[in-house]
Amino acid sequence: MQLKTEVFLVEKEILVYIQTKSIGIEDNSIKLKMTPLLKKFANIGDKVYLKHSTFMLPTKIKAKKEDEVLLEFPSLTPEKPLGDRRNVRVLSDPENPVKVRFNEITKEVYDISEVGFSIKCGMEEIDEILKNKEISEVEIYLPNLEEWIKGSARLVNVREFENGDILCGYELFLDTPDEVKVRFYIYERVKEILKGEK
């Protein structure tokens, strides 16, 4: 399965933006379909930023072939991603979702990063959610570890989409060992998404 992917690289202080397709993952490398701009500007060893869906990751060009480019799969401790987001954010796997518990509420997480998560909310829940913006104890279930971790959270935004869905976004505060657990979940999801599995 080929997934629409975007690549950003800097050439002599100019940002080069390329739309291409992710062909898959092989030997811990991400395979992208070659394009004319990739052929012209991409050099082995160059740093590039890979954007797919809700995440953007720093990586490097590993190899160039006539019809494809190989990128190193990003490390588990990436540098700050390009753009506004401080951390990589991924959609929770709908078949095996991340879950959250707080204030007698249990919900599936819509998306998650090391520093935040979003949940879908109904209009009937908004008033109660707005009354409890600061959550002293939140539990997050990570399906890859089959484990609940604990932290605290703070409501930072409420978004409404054209289809009527409402997302409540929370900043998440975790101890470092639990941040690492979330990071591992995120990078496993990145691999699944780029492979086109889920």
UniProtKB/Swiss-Prot annotation:
Organism's domain of life? Bacteria
Report the sequence similarity comment from the record.
To A.aeolicus aq_1211 and aq_1583.
Give the protein name, as stated in the record.
Uncharacterized protein aq_820
Native species? Aquifex aeolicus (strain VF5)
Which lineage ranks, top first, belong to the organism behind this chain?
A: Bacteria, Pseudomonadati, Aquificota, Aquificia, Aquificales
